[in-house]
Design a protein with these regions (language model features):
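Short, structured coil segments at secondary-structure junctions
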Residues: 21-23
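Anionic-ligand binding patches
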Residues: 2-5, 13, 19, 42-148
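A short beta-strand-loop structural module common to alpha/beta enzyme folds
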Residues: 25-36
Length: 148
């Protein structure tokens, strides 16, 4: 049994949290030729919870494939994705400061949800037939004060 996990996330905060908990992590980041951003495209009519769970599952599948392609030693792989939802509207990463100000204006004085999906995958080993995975969803309600 390995004494570390792979973290398939570019979030410095996720790595910091795991290290604070005493977890030994190895980063398992996408190759330059991987189109990781395309995994985050919102499907028409997709609800926020379904979206964040689907994206996390796709990221986990890509990370497990990356692990296999690179010939790295098998160990659990952790992936996560977080999104903000205002009603059924999924707020993606703002592409400009103007878009960021508009999003903050939309959130001002209102309640929104922060949804985080987490998935852990165990790669297929010699003794098992295939990889296994587990997932969870956390939903937090946040109320913004009025921004002026």
């Amino acid at each position: 049994m390995p004494d570390f996990i792979y973290l398939a996330s570019q979030s410095p905060r996720r790595l910091q949290l795991l290290e604070q908990w005493g977890a030994r992590c190895e980063l398992l980041l996408p190759d330059d030729q991987e189109d990781a951003e395309s995994l985050e495209a919102v499907l028409p009519g997709e609800a926020p919870a379904a979206y964040v769970q689907r994206v996390t599952a796709l990221k986990l599948a890509a990370a497990l494939d990356r692990l296999r392609r690179r010939g790295l030693p098998p160990a659990p792989v952790l992936c996560a994705d977080t999104t903000v939802a205002l009603g059924r509207r999924i707020l993606g990463k703002p592409q400009s400061s103007t878009e960021a100000r508009a999003m903050l204006g939309d959130l001002s004085g209102r309640e929104h949800r922060v949804l985080t999906a987490v998935a852990v995958g165990q790669p297929a080993g010699r003794a098992s037939r295939g990889s296994r995975s587990w997932s969870a969803l956390s939903v937090s309600r946040v109320r913004f004060g009025v921004l002026t």
